[in-house]
Amino acid sequence: DSGPDGKVSIPENAHVLPLEGRLVMPGLIDTHAHGQQAASGFIPQQNWVDYARLGFGVTTVHDPSNDTQSIFAASEMTKAGLITAPRTFSTGRILYGAAGSYKAEIDSLDDAEFHLERMKAVGAFSVKSYNQPRRDQRQQIIKAAREMGMLVVPEGGATFMHNLTMIVDGHTGIEHTVPVEMIYGDVLDLWRGAAVGYTPTLNVAYGGLGGENYWYDVDEVWRNDRVMAFNPPHKVIPRARRRTTAPIEDYNHIRQARITKKLIDQGGLVQAGGHGQLNGICTHWELWSFVQGGMTPFEALRSGTLHGAKYLGMY
């Protein structure tokens, strides 16, 4: 039950919290949250990455690029109550299209189905199509994903013509910023009509200085007790205390954030993704950056909660 104080029956053994003047909200959902889950195959019983996230109210994360063995093992241990962490989901290892030791060769629908089947078997409900160079390769991944009920979140790749074909072909969303300063009605109409989400990761925005640089610049992050309680000093001090500075007009993430405002005004879906830059607070940096681009605080919080749940198929 819910209602005014004095009109709701409260059990005698209930723990009552004084919340006058405070905001009660759902846990934040970070849909692009990188973070190490193991070292040399060993999963720590207490992972500072997860503690930092929980310490800042991030209760669900989706990591679109992580080590397959460690991330899904950690996720299952979390579900079993063996470790304390946010609800953890991931694509596992990316489906990498360039040359390398873990290249995912995709030259047919059968190839795409093979790769998605092996990822689904270890616990993935999403895959990251990462720099597959040809459009038909990306389309084969999408078709296989539709057949298997999986999501496809592509690496944006800082290539605008690729981003547009990703939207047209029906990817679940675009990860990372589009590499242009402004989009206009034609792209907005296309994007809205395709119902493709957008996780801009403004902390590492393409094309110039990103949000992470800005928040280090204007805030004495190392004086934040919660940041320092959960993050190792060597992860904070070098960037926070000996930070660089720049004029406000040099911060490209603000221009990129204006695109996110245009999208939500057109009914688009924009999610928060802190990119794991400084776990915990980086998700909040993303929300604050949304507001710099014109979102209201409510719209930013909606992107960090409801939009993330919709994007991941949880709502």
What residue spans do the PLM features occupy?
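Active-site neighborhoods of metal-dependent hydrolases
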Residues: H115-P133, P179-G293, F298
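Alpha-helix-loop-beta-strand connector modules within alpha/beta enzyme cores
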Residues: E76-I94, R138-G157, A195-P200
